[in-house]
């Protein structure tokens, strides 16, 4: 490097001297000439590169800002997956990504709400009194706050279908056999209960300690039900059947409070109107009616599943009631 600097300086000095000899009027100022060294050239190159990089970053950031609304499109197009453009029957845009129009339905409100399975065997009685024992602390904690009560109920009611569907799914894989449609039926139940929760979240805004209670209850109930289903599926399904009977009772009390004016009959959330295909002017009472009907259908499905096991058969031997609403 030192040789390069000296050689460059020597060339500059020789060039200036020759120009002075050819044209004497050109002043000889070799003593004031500063020769650019290699280090200076490097610094200049680095500054140029950084300036170019900064310019490119500004351009790219501007492009990102301009494409803020196209971020999702860029992501999905990168993977080759394009979102479907879905519209309602009237041509308006479908705004829900958590469910699609073909997953919506009109609930059957004519279902018998008073059906009850009388416990006769020891597992049935154990399941029945387990559910009854859980009702007492719930009544004590929520009392007549039925919106929050419904929210807590749905966080628990959405667990059995997922656990049962998961275990039946694993059994189907393990034994290389079909499930008779029960995987889908149980997962449908779990998804339906979750939609109940999403609906009541719009009605009852839970505070911090209710959210903490949900975390604790869900953690305990999930593991307890998982073990219970592994030990005795007929007991697990029977318990859910009784749990749904309690849910019917709870929503019936909810309706009484609405009819008596103790709870304001507010307009139905938009998500409920689209999910259950309710009228545009539907109210909270209409929502509670369809949710109660859903719980009655879940009651029937789980008591039916328990009866299959009581008869010494497996779920795959009886076609699952898929789409039973």
Curated annotation (Swiss-Prot):
What is the reaction catalyzed? Answer: 2 a ubiquinol + O2 = 2 a ubiquinone + 2 H2O
| Tissues/organs with expression | Expressed in flowers. Detected only in stamen.
Q: Which InterPro entries match?
A: AOX, AOX_sf
Q: What induces it?
A: No effect of antimycin A, ethylene or cold treatments.
Q: Where is it mainly found?
A: mitochondrion
Mark out the transit peptide.
1-44
Q: What is its EC number?
A: 1.10.3.11
- Gene3D superfamilies reported for this sequence: Alternative oxidase (1.20.1260.140)
Chain sites annotated for binding Fe cation 1? 154, 193, 196, 295
Q: Where are the transmembrane segments?
A: 150-170, 212-232
Q: A single GO molecular function, which one?
A: ubiquinol:oxygen oxidoreductase activity
Gene Ontology cellular component terms for the protein in this record = chloroplast; mitochondrial inner membrane; mitochondrion
Q: How is the cofactor bound?
A: Binds 2 iron ions per subunit.
Membrane topology listed for this record = Multi-pass membrane protein
EC class (word): oxidoreductase
Pfam (any one): AOX
Q: Which cofactors does it use?
A: Fe cation
User: Which residues are Fe cation 2-binding?
Assistant: 193, 244, 295, 298
Q: Where in the cell is it found?
A: Mitochondrion inner membrane
Q: Which UniProt keywords apply?
A: Disulfide bond, Electron transport, Iron, Membrane, Metal-binding, Mitochondrion, Mitochondrion inner membrane, Oxidoreductase, Respiratory chain, Transit peptide, Transmembrane, Transmembrane helix, Transport
Protein task: Catalyzes the cyanide-resistant oxidation of ubiquinol and the reduction of molecular oxygen to water, but does not translocate protons and consequently is not linked to oxidative phosphorylation. May increase respiration when the cytochrome respiratory pathway is restricted, or in response to low temperatures.
Q: What quaternary arrangement does the UniProt entry report? A: Homodimer; disulfide-linked.
Query: What name does this protein carry?
Result: Ubiquinol oxidase 1b, mitochondrial
Protein's organism:
Arabidopsis thaliana (Mouse-ear cress)
Query: Gene encoding this chain?
Result: AOX1B
């Amino acid at each position: 490097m030192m040789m390069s600097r000296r050689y460059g300086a020597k060339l500059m000095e020789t060039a200036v001297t020759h120009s002075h000899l050819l044209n004497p009027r050109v002043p000889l100022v070799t003593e004031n000439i500063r020769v650019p060294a290699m280090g200076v050239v490097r610094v200049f190159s680095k500054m140029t590169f950084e300036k170019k990089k900064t310019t490119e970053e500004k351009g790219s950031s501007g492009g990102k800002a301009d494409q803020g609304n196209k971020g999702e499109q860029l992501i999905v197009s990168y993977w080759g997956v394009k979102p479907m453009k879905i519209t309602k029957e009237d041509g308006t845009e479908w705004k829900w990504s958590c469910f699609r129009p073909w997953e919506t339905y009109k609930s059957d409100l004519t279902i018998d709400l008073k059906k009850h399975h009388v416990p006769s065997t020891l597992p049935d009685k154990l399941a029945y009194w387990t559910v009854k024992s859980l009702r007492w602390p719930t009544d004590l904690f929520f009392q007549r706050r039925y919106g929050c009560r419904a929210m807590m109920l749905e966080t628990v009611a959405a667990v059995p279908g997922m656990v049962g569907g998961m275990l039946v799914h694993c059994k189907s894989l393990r034994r290389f056999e079909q499930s008779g449609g029960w995987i889908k039926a149980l997962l449908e139940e779990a998804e339906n209960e979750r939609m109940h929760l999403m609906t009541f979240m719009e009605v009852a805004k839970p505070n911090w300690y209710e959210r903490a209670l949900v975390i604790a209850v869900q953690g305990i109930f999930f593991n307890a039900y998982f073990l219970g289903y592994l030990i005795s599926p007929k007991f697990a399904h029977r318990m859910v059947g009784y749990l749904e009977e309690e849910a019917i009772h709870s929503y019936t009390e909810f309706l009484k409070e609405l009819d008596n004016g103790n709870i304001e009959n507010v307009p139905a959330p938009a998500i409920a109107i689209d999910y259950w295909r309710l009228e545009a002017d539907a109210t909270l009472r209409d929502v509670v009616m369809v949710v109660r009907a859903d719980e009655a259908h879940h009651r029937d499905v789980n008591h039916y599943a328990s009866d299959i096991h009581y008869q010494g058969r497996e779920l795959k031997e009886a076609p699952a009631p898929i789409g039973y609403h």
